[in-house]
From Swiss-Prot:
It comes from the Eukaryota. This is Photosystem I reaction center subunit IX. It comes from Nicotiana sylvestris (Wood tobacco). The keyword Transmembrane helix applies. Pfam families: PSI_PsaJ. The chain crosses the membrane at residues 7-27.
Amino acid sequence: MRDLKTYLSVAPVLSTLWFGALAGLLIEINRFFPDALTFPFFSF
């Protein structure tokens, strides 16, 4: 039961950090490539 409580307290923190980092990455990509449907570094 203690392991379950530890998991339930760690998972929201990790997911908040992960989604915050992902949102920051998307914001920075949109800052350098605004309104891009295709990114120049993905086109071959």
